[in-house]
């Protein structure tokens, strides 16, 4: 059984960037070949693309978790890692993309439009790209950045010109079936239609689309019946058509009270909308009234009697038809086409943009690229935020002392160490950047040259109380029983207390 799904939550994870490579060129008769580690590949993006071949969000309902391909790691001999393959998700026209807060990120209305739903992470630089005059053979590389991971909400709003609204069993499905090639389910019981139906109406050489939404009842805005969720499919319509059942025998119902009840529910739905569809308020949208089931003699007599009263009270054109007998359809078609064409002329032309990218603020000045704030949870601690320092933290291999020293140089050059001094930070203060906390020990002042040191090491770290990678490795071997606990080298005796502590 086909299911119509018009709202889903996607859990997206773009591809992580590949890691850079640490490699030194080795060749006969070339003792100083230099670094030749390649860069990691960019992680794959997750892209939403509009296609006419898809009409529902059903696939995402069953497969909401989506992950793109990771970028390949770099290799020696200057070989860069391959870029992760982009993952393209096909969506139907009229798909609206929202974030977790309900804010609209993109409105995908035209076939071919694309939206980058989650961007892949940048690949890490290899040691060849990190080489400089001061650091000619880096013994480290940068780690690939993680891809974006977040949840997005997709909502489908039908791209119809005409929207049919009415009580259950008013004949909306019958009307769309005789005016177009649509084949909706039709029955003589309430709520036969459980999903929107879309049909194309031909009028001479012109066409327009018509949407039939499930029936409304008084109190739908409070969740009665099928509620108002399906009304999102008439938000884009140029004209609304009230389909009224003139043959109903329900007590307390008549055509005028039916119209008033439906208008009250539409007003309740409009008040709940927090975005502009570009077509104005639903209450200002042109309306028509269709008095259906004129094939029943009593119903036709009632329709003729009330037609003038409805036109005077509401000011809308009124048509008496019979969908079953195909009576009175042509005048209705031509009137709807006239209103739709007029609305199309007034509608602003869409810009031919195939790709939509979320805008991001870019500050090319050094000042303002980071912020230092007191840590509310740690006495005397600080939290540093900013795109660059948080990204650099993710790129750093903290098992490599030289990589940590390189990070310190970058942070100092950005002005963070000077900023911490001005903020009143003391040596040993707890500093948090991008979820990583460490004790602050000033190493470099802004503008100083990098410290020359051996590959994979940094002499500044040896002068501090920081446990080195070699010490951590030996402590791990002791815990696993691979070496004797008292088997320390002469140069490591001083660190024994730190291991045990």
Swiss-Prot record:
Compartment(s) where it occurs, according to its Swiss-Prot or TrEMBL record: Cytoplasm
Positions of the OCT domain: 362-442
Residues annotated to bind Mg(2+): 173, 193
PROSITE patterns per UniProt: G_OBG, GTP1_OBG, OBG, OCT
Pfam families assigned to the protein according to its UniProt record, in alphabetical order: DUF1967 (PF09269), GTP1_OBG (PF01018), MMR_HSR1 (PF01926)
GO molecular function terms noted in the UniProt entry: GTP binding; GTPase activity; magnesium ion binding
Keywords: Cytoplasm, GTP-binding, Hydrolase, Magnesium, Metal-binding, Nucleotide-binding
Binding positions (GTP): 166-173, 191-195, 212-215, 292-295, 322-324
Keyword Ligase: no
Cofactor: Mg(2+)
Domain Obg: 2-159
OBG-type G domain ranges (all copies): 160-341
EC number: 3.6.5.-
InterPro entries: G_OBG (IPR031167), GTP-bd (IPR006073), GTP-bd_Obg/CgtA (IPR014100), GTP-bd_prot_GTP1/OBG_C_sf (IPR036346), GTP1-OBG_CS (IPR006074), GTP1_OBG_dom (IPR006169), GTP1_OBG_dom_sf (IPR036726), OBG_GTPase (IPR045086)
Top EC class, one word: hydrolase
GO biological process: ribosome biogenesis
CDD domains with a match to the protein in the record: Obg
Primary role: An essential GTPase which binds GTP, GDP and possibly (p)ppGpp with moderate affinity, with high nucleotide exchange rates and a fairly low GTP hydrolysis rate. Plays a role in control of the cell cycle, stress response, ribosome biogenesis and in those bacteria that undergo differentiation, in morphogenesis control.
NCBIfam families attached to this UniProt entry: Obg_CgtA, Obg_CgtA_exten, PRK12296.1, PRK12297.1, PRK12299.1
Annotated protein name in UniProt: GTPase Obg
């Amino acid at each position: 059984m086909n299911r119509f799904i018009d709202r889903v939550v996607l859990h997206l994870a773009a591809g992580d960037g590949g890691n850079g490579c640490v490699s030194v060129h080795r060749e006969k008769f070339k003792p100083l070949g230099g670094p030749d580690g390649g860069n990691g590949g960019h992680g794959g993006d997750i892209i939403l693309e509009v296609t006419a071949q898809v009409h529902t969000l059903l696939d995402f309902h069953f497969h909401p978790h989506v992950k793109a391909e990771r970028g390949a790691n770099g290799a020696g001999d200057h070989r860069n890692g391959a870029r992760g393959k982009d993952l393209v998700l096909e969506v139907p026209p009229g798909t609206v993309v929202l974030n977790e807060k309900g804010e609209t990120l993109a409105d995908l209305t035209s076939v071919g439009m694309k939206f980058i739903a989650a961007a892949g992470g940048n690949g890490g630089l290899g040691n060849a790209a990190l080489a400089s005059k001061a650091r000619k053979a880096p013994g480290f590389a940068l780690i690939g950045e993680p891809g974006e991971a977040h949840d997005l909400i997709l909502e489908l709003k039908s791209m119809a010109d005409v929207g049919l609204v009415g009580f259950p069993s008013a004949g909306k499905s019958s009307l769309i079936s005789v005016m177009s090639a649509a084949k909706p389910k039709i029955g003589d019981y309430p709520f036969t239609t459980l999903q929107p139906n879309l049909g194309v109406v031909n009028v001479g050489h012109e066409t327009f689309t018509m949407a039939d939404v499930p029936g409304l009842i008084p109190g739908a805005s409070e969740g009665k019946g099928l509620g108002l969720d399906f009304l999102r499919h008439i938000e884009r319509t140029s004209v609304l058509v009230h389909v009224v059942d003139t043959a109903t025998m329900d007590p307390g119902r008549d055509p005028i009270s039916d119209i008033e009840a439906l208008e009250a529910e539409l007003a309740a739905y409009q008040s709940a909308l927090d975005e502009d569809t570009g077509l104005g308020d639903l209450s200002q949208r042109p309306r028509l009234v269709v008095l259906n089931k004129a094939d029943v003699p009593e119903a036709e007599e009632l329709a003729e009697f009330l037609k003038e009263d409805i036109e005077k009270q509401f000011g809308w054109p009124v048509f008496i038809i019979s969908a079953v007998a195909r009576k009175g359809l042509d005048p209705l078609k031509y009137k709807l086409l006239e209103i739709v064409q007029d609305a199309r002329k007034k509608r602003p032309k869409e810009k031919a943009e195939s790709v939509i990218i979320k805008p991001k603020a870019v500050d090319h000045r050094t000042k303002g690229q980071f912020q230092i704030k007191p840590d509310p949870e740690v006495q005397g601690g600080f939290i540093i935020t900013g795109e660059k320092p948080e990204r650099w933290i993710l790129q750093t291999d903290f098992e490599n002392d030289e990589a940590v020293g390189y990070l310190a140089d970058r942070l100092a050059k950005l002005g963070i160490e000077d900023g911490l001094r001005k903020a009143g930070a003391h040596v040993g203060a707890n500093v948090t950047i991008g979820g990583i906390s460490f004790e602050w020990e000033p190493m470099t002042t802004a503008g100083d040259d990098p410290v020359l040191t051996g590959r994979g090491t940094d002499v500044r770290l040896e002068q501090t109380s920081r446990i080195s990678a070699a010490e951590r490795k030996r402590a791990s071997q002791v815990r696993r029983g691979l070496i004797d606990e008292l088997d320390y080298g002469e140069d490591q005796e001083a660190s024994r207390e730190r291991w045990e502590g």
